[in-house]
Amino acid sequence: MNIRNNARAFILNDNNKILLQKFEFSFTGALKVLWVTPGGGVETGESFAQALERELFEELGVNVEIRNGSVLTLDIPFEGKNGEFISHEVYYLVRMAEDSAFSLENMEEGEKNTFHALKWWTLDELRKTTDEFEPRDAILRLLENSDIVV
């Protein structure tokens, strides 16, 4: 089975809100709109941390140096239009100010066309929303831990 390596960020602000991006996805054949953590695919020759630094620049227009190790690894099976694959996702914890300036200027054209929104979420908002977000359980567990330190 094919494996797609992805580097992703749990971006938290000083109030332990998490930054999520709303995208539409159609790689499984059906259109799905959901909130996800920033990040993306690891390119040949990149470490996961290097890939995340590049992805955060492309998707958010921010320069971040990943200095800490990963906090979570998930292997998520998908049945896509081109067959089955596993999304091997490595997550890092990143702190940013809530008033950080973000830019979509460096986002790839295909991503710009499927991007809907960017939002800081509280734990309470995520518990109450009917919107889909992933990885749901990991995000909720992270925000329930009130003594997160980076």
Where are the regions that the model predicts?
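N-terminal strand-loop-strand
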Residues: 1-36
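Nudix hydrolase/Nudix homology domain
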Residues: 27, 101-150
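Active-site-adjacent beta-strand/loop module that shapes the phosphate/pyrophosphate-binding cleft
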Residues: 75-104
